[in-house]
Amino acid sequence: MPLSNAQLAQTIDHTLLAPDASDAQIRELCRQAAEHRFYSVCVNSANVPLAARELADTGVLVCAVVGFPLGAGLSAAKAFEATVAIAAGAGEIDMVINIGALKSGRADDVKADIDAVHRACGAVPLKVILETGLLTDDEKVRVCEMCRDLGVAFVKTSTGFGHGGATLADVALMRRTVGPVLGVKASGGVRDRAAALAMIEAGATRLGTSSGVAIVTDQDGSASAY
């Protein structure tokens, strides 16, 4: 059965992560999210307080990114950023893994990094960004297995700032690895309705995109950055 606009909107994290995002742009992001009933807005942690105020009593969550976009910070710093973002009003956290540690064969350190943020989140859902464009398929599977074992809420393809974005093949691989329990978030390059529906068909249950309005109104979102 085809997804309704309302159902499709509830898969979307309406996203603005540009370093120069202004208060006015964050307010407009929130206005659009409330109008179209998106699941959340996804913003940098410094913008969480403003977004939380704008979205109070709308039912739209605020999602904050942590260790973004490189994932190369200390685990304690990532955990602290998650803690203060949640205190400021974030209802979900998207963290970036330590990609360098993974490439160096330090899988235990990667898992410990994820676990530190997961513990800091408590009951707040955590999405773990793999940055799939930088990983081999074996590395993608390894991180997805870690996330499954730790019981995080979602695995996520990309930051949208690195090499490449979400691909159907990566979404399908991630879904096969984590099974039906974890969510899979496709982010980076999902800019129109056809791409969104294809990602969902491949196994995505959440979409990170700055083209949410174009997707639910079936317009061209190619001018969007994320």
Curated annotation (Swiss-Prot):
EC number(s) on file: 4.1.2.4
Keyword Lyase: yes
Keyword line: Cytoplasm, Lyase, Schiff base
Active-site residues, as the UniProt record annotates them: 94 (proton donor/acceptor), 156 (schiff-base intermediate with acetaldehyde), 185 (proton donor/acceptor)
InterPro entries attached to this UniProt entry: Aldolase_TIM, DeoC, DeoC/FbaB/LacD_aldolase, DeoC_typeI
UniProt entry tagged with the keyword Cytoplasm: yes
Major enzyme class: lyase
GO biological process, one term: 2-deoxyribose 1-phosphate catabolic process
One Pfam family from the record: DeoC
Pathway: Carbohydrate degradation; 2-deoxy-D-ribose 1-phosphate degradation; D-glyceraldehyde 3-phosphate and acetaldehyde from 2-deoxy-alpha-D-ribose 1-phosphate: step 2/2
Subcellular location: Cytoplasm
GO cellular component: cytoplasm
Protein family membership: Belongs to the DeoC/FbaB aldolase family. DeoC type 1 subfamily.
Entry-linked NCBIfam families: deoC
Protein name: Deoxyribose-phosphate aldolase
Organismal lineage: Bacteria, Pseudomonadati, Pseudomonadota, Betaproteobacteria, Burkholderiales
